[in-house]
């Protein structure tokens, strides 16, 4: 069924197809046509949370929390929405989303297009979803990088009461200078500020919401070791490896190889797994890792668990394989 739907969707502009697919999924959900399935197939504990299974949805598919209920019916163990910023912003000019089917890849330079944290919170409040919900937070494009912490703190404070966990996105290649926050003093200062705010909010709300940080696949071992040291020293709750890559050499002479933006899907598979393994070695079990990047079949999810991830997330694989990828991953992890 999905291969036919994919042929139709791939005939459309990539961003239009994205919205059409989510709207169609929501309609099918509202009509009660998505079969109810038990997603408690492989329970696992992650950052103190009990997941029904370790296969999650990565941020980026539902930026504003508009489709939480429908996505929650697909069997995921957890869902991550966003990236969201304090204020609404349009993102980068279109076209900004490109499929590379010959390589099972996707290039995006969306630029954190979203309706803002206040709108997202209203959408969450209208949702009936009772599962594990992550909120991925970022900074507005107009905010100077030296003031980035202010944006993250605003989002953290507003999202805290509504999230199961919160992800600090400092690794998108589509917001100017954002990746500079991944290193040295900048990383320490940002994460320490967020951990201090987390402690205050835990006292206010009487609940502890874990904080994870999402990193890039384009890091060398020294940078990975530095990040591992910082996240352990500030006692982050988790780390997500990885975001999209800016390296498009795997596309060879493909016409889209020169497009700006982050590359995801199969082309990021090896780079993401390399970072995951090095990170796991340097983290030494001190905090859990969520593996994401290039999961196109069940065996890819199993590989990430074997390399040190506690849980995994999918996104681009869904575009190429459809919702059946979730069950395929769960089946592979059950072996």
Swiss-Prot record:
Alphabetized, the UniProt keywords read: Cell membrane, Flavoprotein, FMN, Membrane, Oxidoreductase, Pyrimidine biosynthesis
**Family, per the entry?**
Belongs to the dihydroorotate dehydrogenase family. Type 2 subfamily.
- Cofactor dependency: FMN
Indicate the segments annotated as coiled coil, or none if absent: none
UniProt organism field: Neisseria meningitidis serogroup A / serotype 4A (strain DSM 15465 / Z2491)
The terms under GO molecular function for this entry are:
dihydroorotate dehydrogenase (quinone) activity
Please report the name of this protein according to its UniProt entry: Dihydroorotate dehydrogenase (quinone)
What's the catalysed reaction? (S)-dihydroorotate + a quinone = orotate + a quinol
Q: Which InterPro entries match?
A: Aldolase_TIM, DHO_dehydrogenase, Dihydroorotate_DH_1_2, Dihydroorotate_DH_2, Dihydroorotate_DH_cat, Dihydroorotate_DH_CS
One GO term of the biological process aspect? 'de novo' UMP biosynthetic process
Please name the pathway: Pyrimidine metabolism; UMP biosynthesis via de novo pathway; orotate from (S)-dihydroorotate (quinone route): step 1/1
Spell out the subcellular localization from the entry. Answer: Cell membrane
Membrane topology according to the record: Peripheral membrane protein
Q: Where does FMN bind?
A: 59-63, 83, 136, 169, 214, 242, 265, 294, 315-316
Top enzyme class, one word, equals: oxidoreductase
Assembly information from the UniProt record = Monomer.
| Role description | Catalyzes the conversion of dihydroorotate to orotate with quinone as electron acceptor.
Binding sites annotated in the UniProt record for substrate: 63, 108-112, 169, 174, 243-244
């Amino acid at each position: 069924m999905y291969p036919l739907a994919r042929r139709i969707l791939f005939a459309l502009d990539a961003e239009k197809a994205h919205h059409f697919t989510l709207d169609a999924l929501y309609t099918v959900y509202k009509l009660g046509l998505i079969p109810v399935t038990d997603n408690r197939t492989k329970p696992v504990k992650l950052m103190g949370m009990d997941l029904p299974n370790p296969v999650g949805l990565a941020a980026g598919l539902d930026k504003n929390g508009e489709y939480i209920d429908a996505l929650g019916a697909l069997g995921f163990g957890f869902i991550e929405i966003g990236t969201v910023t304090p204020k609404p912003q349009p993102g980068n000019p279109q076209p900004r989303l490109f499929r590379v089917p010959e390589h099972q890849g996707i290039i995006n330079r969306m630029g954190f297009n979203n309706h803002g944290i206040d709108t997202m919170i209203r959408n969450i409040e209208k949702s009936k979803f009772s599962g594990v919900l992550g909120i991925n937070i970022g900074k507005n494009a107009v905010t100077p990088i030296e003031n980035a912490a202010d944006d993250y703190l605003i989002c953290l404070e507003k999202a805290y009461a509504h999230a199961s966990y919160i992800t600090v996105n400092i690794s998108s290649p589509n917001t100017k200078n954002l990746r500079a926050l991944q290193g040295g003093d900048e990383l320490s200062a940002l994460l320490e500020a967020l951990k201090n705010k987390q402690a205050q909010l835990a006292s206010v709300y009487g609940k502890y919401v874990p904080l994870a940080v999402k990193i890039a696949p384009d890091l060398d071992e020294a940078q990975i070791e530095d990040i591992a040291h910082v996240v352990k020293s500030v006692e982050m709750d988790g780390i997500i490896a990885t975001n999209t890559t800016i390296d498009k050499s795997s596309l060879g002479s493909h016409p889209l190889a020169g497009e700006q933006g982050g590359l995801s899907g199969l082309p990021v598979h090896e780079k993401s797994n390399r970072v995951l393994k090095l990170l796991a070695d340097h983290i030494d079990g001190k905090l859990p890792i969520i593996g994401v990047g290039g999961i196109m079949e069940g065996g890819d999810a199993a590989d990430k668990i074997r390399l040190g991830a506690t849980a995994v997330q999918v996104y681009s694989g869904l575009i190429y394989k459809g919702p059946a990828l979730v069950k395929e991953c769960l089946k592979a992890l059950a072996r």
